[in-house]
Amino acid sequence: SVIRTMKSIEDSDFEIPGEFRAILRGYQKTGFRWLKTLDACGFGGILADDMGLGKTIQVISLLYDEQKAEEKKPSLIICPASMVYNWESEFERFAPSIKVCMVAGTAPEREAAISHLAECDVAVTSYDLLKRDIALYQKQQFRYQVIDEAQYIKNPMTQGARAVKAIQSECRFALTGTPVENRLSELWSIFDYLMPGFLYTYDKFKKRYESPIVKDQDEEALGRLQRMTAPFILRRLKSDVLKEL
């Protein structure tokens, strides 16, 4: 039934927030509804649109919509250091009413920012700083957790990947233009962050999917994996949405 829900996203009754109706393109409105549908069903997902198709604004529209929730909790965005201030300026541009807290700067500045997260709507930090500050986040509970350039956690054994997975959040999303760059274990690691256990332990995943697909070119195993993960990955290419650009 989840799959059925996912397939009827175009007709879903999630209203696009008024401020975004004129800004979002058609496929971005579908993206907003897709994120809302996954959240409502208790799942996370990978927004894997091509570069330049506005993954950021689709997430901002989701976070803006959360403003009307009765019990508000802050959300957390984790991205490469080079993108931190890009996120800040996109919020200022599209949703200036959202109170954004930048967890950056010196260690004391970051500690002060983290201790005041309850006063913010959204916190933004980098993978590197999250890794250093992870102990300070232990008491924090987030509504949404969004990782940008999710290939940063493609190796599940790194401190960065472990830090991201240690954060407590109600709903998790990942943004990436390349869900799998080189190895299927990268996809496993992103799903291990989104919905731990959904693709089993890594050993079991390797036995069931990775080894048969990579070593034996097993089409049936590949088909099973695609069917299992498809509802949780939304990827549009520029060529798919040319007429809307």
Feature-to-residue mapping (PLM):
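ASCE P-loop NTPase motor core, strongest for the SF2 helicase catalytic module
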Residues: 2-217, 224-245
